[in-house]
Amino acid sequence: YIDAETMHLHHDKHHQAYVNNANAALEKHPEIGEDLEALLADVESIPADIRQALINNGGGHLNHALFWELMTPEKTAPSAELAAAIDATFGSFEEFQAAFTAAATTRFGSGWAWLVVNKEGKLEVTSTANQDTPISEGKKPILGL
């Protein structure tokens, strides 16, 4: 359970600040475009003077956008395809939950726990610090907390 005050803070304050700051950085270099996923997949292509701002704020925007997209008041189960992939990778849904919980609870300071598809096309549980996104590591996030 996450209380309304925490949700308001993250949605209306934190997430909005990430969007505003990412947009301000992008305005300095209109030639690079506005596709944050593409830019963060190749951070070295981002001009040095805005690179860290986009890593922090672009990552914060993408991370929170996925979080909001996945949130629902109803309890949901993974699709049959995802459930089979979880079982094949982790042994069971319960083992996946244990790995995901460990990634979330052992992250020192702020950050995210992720279920991602890695470069080899396999599921992986990982963790990133602060607002770093697994996209910068060539991974596709499918669940984030």
Curated annotation (Swiss-Prot):
Binds 1 Mn(2+) or Fe(3+) ion per subunit. Changing residue 32 to T: In strain: CIP 102922T. Residues 126-145 are annotated as: Disordered. Keywords: Iron, Manganese, Metal-binding, Oxidoreductase. Mn(2+) binds at residues 10, 64. It holds the Pfam family Sod_Fe_C. Changing residue 138 to S: In strain: NEM1121. InterPro entries: Mn/Fe_SOD, Mn/Fe_SOD_C, Mn/Fe_SOD_N, Mn/Fe_SOD_N_sf, SOD_C_sf. It catalyses: 2 superoxide + 2 H(+) = H2O2 + O2. SUPFAM superfamilies: Fe,Mn superoxide dismutase (SOD), C-terminal domain, Fe,Mn superoxide dismutase (SOD), N-terminal domain. GO terms for molecular function: metal ion binding; superoxide dismutase activity. It is an enzyme of class 1 (oxidoreductase). Fe(3+) binds at residues 10, 64. Changing residue 44 to D: In strain: CIP 102922T. Its EC number is 1.15.1.1. Its cofactor is Mn(2+); Fe(3+). GO terms for cellular component: cytoplasm. Belongs to the iron/manganese superoxide dismutase family. Destroys superoxide anion radicals which are normally produced within the cells and which are toxic to biological systems. Catalyzes the dismutation of superoxide anion radicals into O2 and H2O2 by successive reduction and oxidation of the transition metal ion at the active site. This is Superoxide dismutase [Mn/Fe].
